[in-house]
Amino acid sequence: MIGRIAGVLLEKNPPHLLIDCNGVGYEVDVPMSTFYNLPGTGEKVVLLTQMIVREDAHLLYGFLTPQERSTFRELLKITGIGARMALAVLSGMSVQELSQTVTMQDAARLTRVPGIGKKTAERLLLELKGKLGADLGAMAGAASQSDHASDILNALLALGYSEKEGLAAIKNVPAGTGVSEGIKLALKALSKA
């Protein structure tokens, strides 16, 4: 499986990207929330990915934050929700908005996402209840400890640490800490673990 991709962004054509990794171009689909936060073409980009293998294709979906990827994975577990629909949900609302929608059981908000009708919205609310809020709350709490949490996490992932280890280490980084200092503090926390 491909869990992370780092390279030069060659093409941006919503929701498709082409990323050059040492001479190999990977096509990656991303939600619009990720797309709007990408650097310009010709610049370096790092994405967390979910690879889906089908009979007729191997597909990569990319995300800037661990929260987006874990939410995408939760959506895929729901009967009747495929990768395209999960991508549409994450393009139609942020992870925090989805969490609030599930908490408030707001089916009407979900039906505003293209392709989601009333029954699908109700099934999403039912199956995500309790799962999404707890996971997102823990991850968002860890990530919000630092203004540069996603940059620090990406650096830790590049050094070979797991997402779980990285999120745990970020908890030790005070809010407002710069990226380089945050990486040092996170590595120090990981060395003690």
UniProtKB/Swiss-Prot annotation:
<comment type="function">
    <text>The RuvA-RuvB-RuvC complex processes Holliday junction (HJ) DNA during genetic recombination and DNA repair, while the RuvA-RuvB complex plays an important role in the rescue of blocked DNA replication forks via replication fork reversal (RFR). RuvA specifically binds to HJ cruciform DNA, conferring on it an open structure. The RuvB hexamer acts as an ATP-dependent pump, pulling dsDNA into and through the RuvAB complex. HJ branch migration allows RuvC to scan DNA until it finds its consensus sequence, where it cleaves and resolves the cruciform DNA.</text>
</comment>
<dbReference type="GO" id="GO:0005737">
    <property type="term" value="C:cytoplasm"/>
</dbReference>
<dbReference type="Pfam" id="PF01330">
    <property type="entry name" value="RuvA_N"/>
</dbReference>
<dbReference type="GO" id="GO:0000400">
    <property type="term" value="F:four-way junction DNA binding"/>
</dbReference>
<dbReference type="InterPro" id="IPR012340">
    <property type="entry name" value="NA-bd_OB-fold"/>
</dbReference>
<keyword id="KW-0238">DNA-binding</keyword>
<dbReference type="InterPro" id="IPR011114">
    <property type="entry name" value="RuvA_C"/>
</dbReference>
<dbReference type="GO" id="GO:0006310">
    <property type="term" value="P:DNA recombination"/>
</dbReference>
<feature type="region of interest" description="Domain III">
    <location>
        <begin position="144"/>
        <end position="193"/>
    </location>
</feature>
<dbReference type="GO" id="GO:0005524">
    <property type="term" value="F:ATP binding"/>
</dbReference>
<dbReference type="InterPro" id="IPR013849">
    <property type="entry name" value="DNA_helicase_Holl-junc_RuvA_I"/>
</dbReference>
<dbReference type="Pfam" id="PF14520">
    <property type="entry name" value="HHH_5"/>
</dbReference>
<feature type="region of interest" description="Domain I">
    <location>
        <begin position="1"/>
        <end position="64"/>
    </location>
</feature>
<dbReference type="GO" id="GO:0009378">
    <property type="term" value="F:four-way junction helicase activity"/>
</dbReference>
<comment type="similarity">
    <text>Belongs to the RuvA family.</text>
</comment>
<dbReference type="InterPro" id="IPR003583">
    <property type="entry name" value="Hlx-hairpin-Hlx_DNA-bd_motif"/>
</dbReference>
<comment type="subunit">
    <text>Homotetramer. Forms an RuvA(8)-RuvB(12)-Holliday junction (HJ) complex. HJ DNA is sandwiched between 2 RuvA tetramers; dsDNA enters through RuvA and exits via RuvB. An RuvB hexamer assembles on each DNA strand where it exits the tetramer. Each RuvB hexamer is contacted by two RuvA subunits (via domain III) on 2 adjacent RuvB subunits; this complex drives branch migration. In the full resolvosome a probable DNA-RuvA(4)-RuvB(12)-RuvC(2) complex forms which resolves the HJ.</text>
</comment>
<keyword id="KW-0227">DNA damage</keyword>
<keyword id="KW-0233">DNA recombination</keyword>
<keyword id="KW-0963">Cytoplasm</keyword>
<dbReference type="GO" id="GO:0006281">
    <property type="term" value="P:DNA repair"/>
</dbReference>
<protein>
    <recommendedName>
        <fullName>Holliday junction branch migration complex subunit RuvA</fullName>
    </recommendedName>
</protein>
<dbReference type="Pfam" id="PF07499">
    <property type="entry name" value="RuvA_C"/>
</dbReference>
<dbReference type="InterPro" id="IPR010994">
    <property type="entry name" value="RuvA_2-like"/>
</dbReference>
<dbReference type="GO" id="GO:0009379">
    <property type="term" value="C:Holliday junction helicase complex"/>
</dbReference>
<feature type="region of interest" description="Domain II">
    <location>
        <begin position="65"/>
        <end position="139"/>
    </location>
</feature>
<dbReference type="GO" id="GO:0048476">
    <property type="term" value="C:Holliday junction resolvase complex"/>
</dbReference>
<feature type="region of interest" description="Flexible linker">
    <location>
        <begin position="139"/>
        <end position="143"/>
    </location>
</feature>
<keyword id="KW-0234">DNA repair</keyword>
<dbReference type="InterPro" id="IPR000085">
    <property type="entry name" value="RuvA"/>
</dbReference>
<dbReference type="InterPro" id="IPR036267">
    <property type="entry name" value="RuvA_C_sf"/>
</dbReference>
